[in-house]
Amino acid sequence: MTTPRPLERRSATEQAHLDAMLHQVFEQNIAFHKALGFQLSSLDPAAPALSFNMRPDLIGHFVHGRLHGGVISTALDAAAGLAVIVGIAEKFAHETADQVAHRFSRVGTIDLRTDYLHQGIGKKFTATGRLTRLGGRIASAQMTLTNETGQLIATGSASYVIS
């Protein structure tokens, strides 16, 4: 009996191409992400993350200068979506960047829960996602939003259709 040969990972050049595509899509092509100033800060499959700076147009409570709750939810949704995308890229690591990118077009949020834990006060915020399940049709993720001091602002969980 022969042992199946493990599938090879995409080359470093292909991975760099995929990483560049993810930056382009998340930072430029998704207009709302661009308007909010989201920047990918990590594509680590264990903890993909995005960051953004506080700006006056992101304030939700004008007296206290707090980050708007909708921005918090959007950042958490984006971080969870990023975790799902990176998880798909890992699951299909034998595919080229263009092949795996085609799979991303089928990802969509079907459920999002946000728990606001502290006031959204800070100069810079980081949203981190963690893939908890990647099935054939549905993926689940958990996420956190922290400020530059590491204070936990919000947590969330989300489910995504992936096929």
Q: Model features per residue range: what roles?
A:
Residues 1-163:
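Terminal targeting signals and extreme-terminal segments of soluble enzymes
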